[in-house]
Structure formats: structure tokens, C-alpha cells
Swiss-Prot record:
The keyword Metal-binding does not apply. The keyword Chaperone does not apply. Keywords: Ribonucleoprotein, Ribosomal protein, RNA-binding, rRNA-binding. Belongs to the universal ribosomal protein uL18 family. This is Large ribosomal subunit protein uL18. InterPro entries: Ribosomal_uL18_bac-type, Ribosomal_uL18_bac/euk. GO terms for molecular function: 5S rRNA binding; structural constituent of ribosome. Part of the 50S ribosomal subunit; part of the 5S rRNA/L5/L18/L25 subcomplex. Contacts the 5S and 23S rRNAs.
């Protein structure tokens, strides 16, 4: 049990360190944050000043019917980019939420960049 608590503390410390470095998302450049569960992948774009979610996307959405793998997460990035372009948002702050920048996280960020979003 002690190892689990130490790992949780390290994760919280890592998240805080990343958030301190990237700053807050504002209306001109909102923050996109990632969450991975064992089964699903979630991303949401947040304006931290207002405290409002501007756009979100996840593999749990029935109309998308995607799984949690790199190719589907890239499609998820393209869907989010389209939703952001509809709202005239072209610049984001990328918050990897303590996850390593590889695999699903890197694929998602790459898909956003390829779709024309400045991350």
C-alpha cells in the first residue's frame, strides 16, 4: 500500500510541475487536457479564466465508435480539430496531464498539428 501512495504522490507532483510550467488556458489560447482510462481516451479544451469547457471529444462517443488505439486516437484528434475550427480556435496549450509524451499522447498531438491546430 505504501508504494501505491508514493506513486500517487509522484503523479500529483508531476501534474503540478507540468501545470506550473504551461500556465493557464485563456480564450485566445485555451488548454487541451488529456485523460486516459483503461478503456477510453478523453480530451477537452478548457478556458481556465472562465472555467468552461469549450470542446471535448472521447472514444466513448457513440457516433464516433472508436477504440483506444493509436489510429483511432489520431482520428479523435482530427475530430477535435474540426470542432475547434468551427469555433475559430487555432492555437492551444497542450497539457499532457502527467502522461509521457509517446504512444497515444504523441499520436493525438500529431493529429492536431496535422489538422492545422498550433499546439
Amino acid at each position: 500500500m505504501k508504494k501505491v501512495k508514493e506513486a500517487e504522490k509522484k503523479n500529483i507532483k508531476r501534474k503540478k510541475r507540468i501545470r506550473d510550467r504551461i500556465g493557464f488556458g485563456v480564450a485566445e489560447r485555451p488548454r487541451v487536457t488529456i485523460f486516459k482510462s483503461n478503456k477510453y481516451f478523453y480530451a477537452q479544451v478548457i478556458d481556465d479564466i472562465v472555467g468552461r469547457t469549450l470542446a471535448s471529444v472521447s472514444t466513448i462517443e457513440k457516433e464516433l465508435s472508436l477504440n483506444k488505439n493509436i489510429s483511432d486516437v489520431k482520428k479523435l484528434g482530427e475530430v477535435l480539430a474540426k470542432r475547434l475550427k468551427d469555433k475559430n480556435i487555432s492555437k492551444l496549450i497542450f497539457d499532457r496531464n502527467g502522461y509521457k509524451y509517446h504512444g497515444l499522447i504523441a499520436g493525438f498531438a500529431t493529429a492536431l498539428r496535422e489538422a492545422g491546430i498550433d499546439v
